[in-house]
């Protein structure tokens, strides 16, 4: 894990210890080599689907997909992309709940590689440390940018924040539409999946839990 930030190392280790890391096998393939190999195989796949890759609308599609996978929608598989985190001492002695809601979640279902689209809400009770508000959004985005299962993603965000804040008092909920349900299979266009992960006082204290959930309405 050389070259990773201290925050990235701590979060990765915490997830591995809890069995919550996304299933991955490390390799030494560079970003550019990954894109070259993905582009090559994507040409084969699209050719097997009888698409004419000499057409000017399609000829760059394998390259676009490879770049999108490595640099964008699956960039969260690489911990060198973990956001730079600002955590400061709670010198103001803030003790009330901090809640960020309506955080955009755009991820990819790891079963069919189609879109998961939704919103997240994150809350924590400040103890010794406070995290920059935009960092919460960036952490959500980091874990969304990989093939995912919503249940695991919710837990990953929880553990990442608990680790960085050095506090169990964190809550996360995600409401999302899964296009593996909406656009294929059962083709249910209206259903939504909700997952919640609660830690510390959010799990042990019904009043705190209710305050968090009530604030999402």
Swiss-Prot record:
Reactions the enzyme catalyzes: GTP + H2O = 7,8-dihydroneopterin 3'-triphosphate + formate + H(+)
GO annotation terms (biological process): one-carbon metabolic process; tetrahydrobiopterin biosynthetic process; tetrahydrofolate biosynthetic process
UniProt keyword terms in alphabetical order: GTP-binding, Hydrolase, Metal-binding, Nucleotide-binding, One-carbon metabolism, Zinc
Gene Ontology molecular function, alphabetical: GTP binding; GTP cyclohydrolase I activity; zinc ion binding
InterPro entries, A to Z: GTP-CH-I_C/QueF, GTP-CH-I_N, GTP_CycHdrlase_I, GTP_CycHdrlase_I_CS, GTP_CycHdrlase_I_dom
Binding site residues for Zn(2+): 109, 112, 180
One GO CC annotation: cytoplasm
Pathway entry: Cofactor biosynthesis; 7,8-dihydroneopterin triphosphate biosynthesis; 7,8-dihydroneopterin triphosphate from GTP: step 1/1
EC number per UniProt: 3.5.4.16
The family this protein is said to belong to: Belongs to the GTP cyclohydrolase I family.
Subunit structure of this chain's protein: Toroid-shaped homodecamer, composed of two pentamers of five dimers.
Annotated protein name in UniProt: GTP cyclohydrolase 1
Source organism of this protein record: Vibrio campbellii (strain ATCC BAA-1116)
